[in-house]
Swiss-Prot record:
Residues 16-25 have a biased composition (Basic and acidic residues). This is Flagellar calcium-binding protein TB-1.7G. Keywords: Calcium, Cell projection, Cilium, Flagellum, Metal-binding, Repeat. SUPFAM superfamilies: EF-hand (SSF47473). Residues 1-25, 202-229 are annotated as: Disordered. Ca(2+) 2 binds at D139, D141, S143, E150. It comes from the Eukaryota. Residues 44-79, 80-115, 126-161, 163-198 form the EF-hand domain. May contribute to the rapid motility of the trypanosomes, playing a role either in flagellar structure or in calcium metabolism. Could alternate between a GDP-bound inactive form to a calcium/GTP-bound active form. Belongs to the calflagin family. Residues 210-221 have a biased composition (Low complexity).
Amino acid sequence: GSKNASNPKDGAASKGGKDGKTTADRKVAWERIRCAIPRDKDAESKSRRIELFKQFDTNGTGKLGFREVLDGCYGILKLDEFTTHLPDIVQRAFDKAKDLGNKVKGVGEEDLVEFLEFRLMLCYIYDIFELTVMFDTMDKDGSLLLELQEFKEALPKLKEWGVDITDATTVFNEIDTNGSGVVTFDEFSCWAVTKKLQVCGDPDDEENGANEGDGANAGDGVPAAEGSA
């Protein structure tokens, strides 16, 4: 897509200039944030996630509304150090996690995220941030746009991230939804996050003192990220 193709509201985590944060700003923030988001499925991460959920759940209902999630992302995780588009990113993550969680359970609370979906939401936010760092690395000329050659050179990194591509040109053209010959961050992130969640995303399966213990046990979740992408 062209520079004009991306929706300003969806400019989540665009590069310096569009986002108001520079590549250097994001790199520094990412080193802290990647450790602050407890998205893994080991015992320590589960314990941290339970505690974080309780901190987010200011009303003590065992369910999080969007405002509670956004407030927690600002006040507790301080994710705004990475991007000036945090509300857009959190809204996407909130909706995605809620929808996927409801699909797994067969039921779900409308406009609320329960503990079962909490890990999904954290994974989605983490993935968007990780994608931004990756896009910074792939976009070698700093044009805010990804060209086919840059995309081809990044295939090994994409494979590490969980997306194995055999026909780079065909996939690139699929991502380039308006056929402009270049890919914006929004086009790239929408494609890549969907691919990654299909491969790796799954809800939490532990109980947190409520009634969430019937969650899916679909796998071990998102693999360890490449730190500097």
